[in-house]
Amino acid sequence: MIENNAAYLQTLGQQAKQASYALAGLTGQQKQALLSAIAGSLTKNSATILAANAKDVVAARSNGLNDAMIDRLLLDESRLQGVIGDIDNVINLTDPVGTELESQVLDNGLRLSRRRVPLGVIGVIYEARPNVTVDIAVLALKTGNAVILRGGKETLQSNLALSEAIRAAVVEQGLPADSVQLIQSPDRALVSGLLKLDQFVDMIVPRGGQNLQRLCAEQATIPVILGGIGICHLYADKDADIAKSIAVIANAKVQRPTVCNALDTVLVHEAIADQLLPQLYTHLAASGVTFYGCQSAQAIADKLGVAISIATEETYGQEWLSLTLGVKVVSDIDTAIDHIRTYSSGHSEGILTDSIHASAHFVNEVDSAAVYVNASTRFTDGGQFGLGAEVAVSTQKLHARGPMGLEALTTYKWIGVGEYTARS
């Protein structure tokens, strides 16, 4: 029980800021050794971690959490080994810290350069995925940042065990344990307090649903990276290959329907709707997909005897996170683009077409973090983009956009070197 939230957070912030100074000076080789030590510590403490996770699962079941939520918080031996294996992927990534981005010699002889440096202290608020504890800590440390973690109450025991194993490795490497800190209470007031810890925390990353994103946007006095909400679209143009389009749409919808880069609405040009939609309905219905559609989409479904509900303004603006799909028939590409502009969260959109002109028009006019031509929205992922594990997927435009890898956890400083140069 934390008696004084403000004092508790103040201490966490001070400790994190102090730790960040030590981390900022690490060499690439020292960071590699640190991450290797973390992998070793997680392996060594795997029995403790799995036992803690089992307690979370038992509590989740007793509290009536659904199977999908329990699956998200579950860690078994295989999943834990996968999390540990991902650390090797991060170790092998190029360390962006210290990279010289540009340099020049000014007319007055001043040698000016711009160098990539750590942000400092990062606060991450996330929900029922214990693997995020490891992913975020490893990415933060790789870039020389301290991190304050606030996980969901459903995974508190798992997160405590994971963070203690990580901290043990940090200390083993001669670094401050407070390089990685976990808020050890489910009290929601601590989230509001963390959002105002601007004296110590340089960036907040919320990984969660709309309510968490809104809370952070409204209450934070620290820069916040918003995102993770994916209302994703695919538009099948009049020049699309129908068979190939159905395969891509099915991948985007069915492969992992509970993630933010899964497809929510498919838009179909009226010229191919009578050909594409009957095949699409049959294919997706076999996988358990249910549909909301416009009147034209509904008429085609009715002929097949496929159940479909009428789409509304509310359903078009829904991130389904399930086997549900919105369907709309449109008169042309610009109508599709207008629909996306109205309902998209700015995450991932795509066009399916064999027309170079149509694909170029779509890419130029759709303003989302990731825009695809003849590809699934499911590719919007740090691992798929070659960034390693991701911190989050940002749907805003400042600082970071799209999957956030190592570079998104850095900033830059200007360095000027003179010969006792004074400004004239």
Swiss-Prot record:
Tell me, in a sentence or two, what this protein's role is.
Catalyzes the NADPH-dependent reduction of L-glutamate 5-phosphate into L-glutamate 5-semialdehyde and phosphate. The product spontaneously undergoes cyclization to form 1-pyrroline-5-carboxylate.
What is the uppermost EC class here?
oxidoreductase
- Give each disulfide bond as a residue pair: none
Q: Major place of localization?
A: cytoplasm
Among InterPro entries, the record links this protein to: Ald_DH/histidinol_DH (IPR016161), Ald_DH_C (IPR016163), Ald_DH_N (IPR016162), Aldehyde_DH_dom (IPR015590), G-glutamylP_reductase_CS (IPR020593), Glu-5-SA_DH (IPR012134), GPR_dom (IPR000965)
- One GO term of the biological process aspect: L-proline biosynthetic process
The record's catalysed reaction(s) read: L-glutamate 5-semialdehyde + phosphate + NADP(+) = L-glutamyl 5-phosphate + NADPH + H(+)
Instruction: Please identify the protein, giving its name as recorded.
Output: Gamma-glutamyl phosphate reductase
Organism field: Shewanella sediminis (strain HAW-EB3)
Tell me which positions the record assigns to the signal sequence: none
Q: Which Pfam families match?
A: Aldedh
Alphabetized UniProt keyword annotations = Amino-acid biosynthesis, Cytoplasm, NADP, Oxidoreductase, Proline biosynthesis
